């Protein structure tokens, strides 16, 4: 008698199939590890896909040098515990030129330290496929992107020239220099991710849990004072509030939400009641209309 899979089991099976398909079809895949909750789920699925062997590809983190300190500590611990090779790439030219979110703005900073940094790493190590944790429910440009997303030799994405995806059949053919970005969590929602983390007891960065943290209110967002590089503007004062993060990125560009949810069941309950996107807290999404789609066309994940 066949067993009916639950909703989460169906999502898990689809994601594991996608991960295995990439390993079977590509010569040199890599998993982008941004240290957030989606990366945590994706890494967990990859470990399941090849258990008891480790995943047959490295992790890649594009370090902008502005991530939360707790994220970097968590990244190093997880890589060591999983026994995986961790490649950390920094755009040294950007560092040399002093590119920062404060002095150059979020758009230029993201382009130099994230997009260009990612393209440098993919070219340097000659990866032909890269896993990412993006989901279709996050943002409108991601909603229309394929699971196997073709990139030109310049890493560009053309939303008007996407390959058909019928059922679970994926076109993996590329020419030398071209690559594919692969999104195993495309069909997951934010709530699915949290419920799966709870079900599988997946470790996540403590910043997702509510705690009293030092923040400043800036441009309608609560920005955490993570180190002494955050300079206060006139009239700003540091406040200590109970906050958590729904999404994690570079700390000067990521807004916290006031919350007392310090357990997974409480976070899930919040998700059931919220009516705003998790990416409302990401300043880079507010640069201009169609901001994310423009970034993706230029090579952003």
UniProtKB/Swiss-Prot annotation:
Gene Ontology biological process: hydrogen sulfide biosynthetic process; sulfate assimilation
Protein name: Sulfate adenylyltransferase subunit 2
InterPro entries membership: PAPS_reduct_dom, Rossmann-like_a/b/a_fold, SO4_adenylTrfase_ssu, Sulfate_adenylyltrnsfr_sub2
Recorded metabolic or biological pathway in which this protein acts: Sulfur metabolism; hydrogen sulfide biosynthesis; sulfite from sulfate: step 1/3
Gene: cysD
Record GO terms (molecular function): ATP binding; sulfate adenylyltransferase (ATP) activity
Purpose of the protein: With CysN forms the ATP sulfurylase (ATPS) that catalyzes the adenylation of sulfate producing adenosine 5'-phosphosulfate (APS) and diphosphate, the first enzymatic step in sulfur assimilation pathway. APS synthesis involves the formation of a high-energy phosphoric-sulfuric acid anhydride bond driven by GTP hydrolysis by CysN coupled to ATP hydrolysis by CysD.
Catalytic activity: sulfate + ATP + H(+) = adenosine 5'-phosphosulfate + diphosphate
Self-association state and partner proteins as the record states: Heterodimer composed of CysD, the smaller subunit, and CysN.
EC number(s) given by UniProt: 2.7.7.4
Keywords for this protein: ATP-binding, Nucleotide-binding, Nucleotidyltransferase, Transferase
Protein family membership: Belongs to the PAPS reductase family. CysD subfamily.
PANTHER family: SULFATE ADENYLYLTRANSFERASE SUBUNIT 2 (PTHR43196:SF1)
């Amino acid at each position: 008698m066949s067993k009916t899979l639950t909703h989460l089991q169906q999502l898990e099976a689809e994601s594991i199939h996608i991960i295995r398909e990439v390993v079977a079809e590509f010569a040199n895949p890599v998993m982008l590890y941004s240290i957030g909750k989606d990366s945590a789920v994706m890494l967990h699925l990859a470990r399941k896909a090849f258990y008891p062997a480790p995943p047959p590809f490295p992790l890649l983190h594009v370090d902008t040098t502005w991530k939360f300190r707790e994220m970097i500590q968590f990244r190093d611990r997880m890589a060591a515990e999983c026994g995986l090779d961790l490649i950390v790439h920094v755009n040294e030219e950007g560092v040399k030129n002093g590119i920062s979110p404060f002095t150059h703005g979020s758009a230029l900073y993201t382009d130099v330290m994230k997009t260009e940094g990612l393209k440098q790493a993919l070219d340097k190590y000659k990866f032909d496929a890269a896993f990412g944790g993006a989901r279709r429910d996050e943002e409108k440009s991601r909603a229309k992107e394929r699971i196997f997303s073709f990139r030109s030799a310049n890493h560009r994405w053309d939303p008007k020239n996407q390959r058909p995806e019928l059922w679970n059949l994926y076109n993996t053919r590329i020419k030398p220099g071209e690559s594919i970005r692969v999104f195993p969590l495309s069909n997951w929602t934010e709530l699915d991710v949290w419920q799966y983390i709870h079900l599988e007891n997946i470790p996540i960065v403590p910043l997702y849990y509510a705690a009293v943290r030092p923040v400043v209110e800036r441009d309608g967002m609560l920005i955490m004072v993570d180190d002494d590089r955050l300079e206060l503007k006139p009239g700003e004062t540091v406040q200590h509030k109970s906050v958590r993060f729904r999404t994690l990125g570079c700390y000067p560009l990521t807004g916290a939400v006031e919350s007392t949810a310090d357990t997974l069941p409480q976070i899930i309950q919040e998700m059931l009641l919220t009516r705003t996107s998790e990416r409302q807290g990401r300043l880079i999404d507010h640069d201009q209309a169609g901001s994310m789609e423009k970034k993706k066309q230029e090579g952003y994940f």
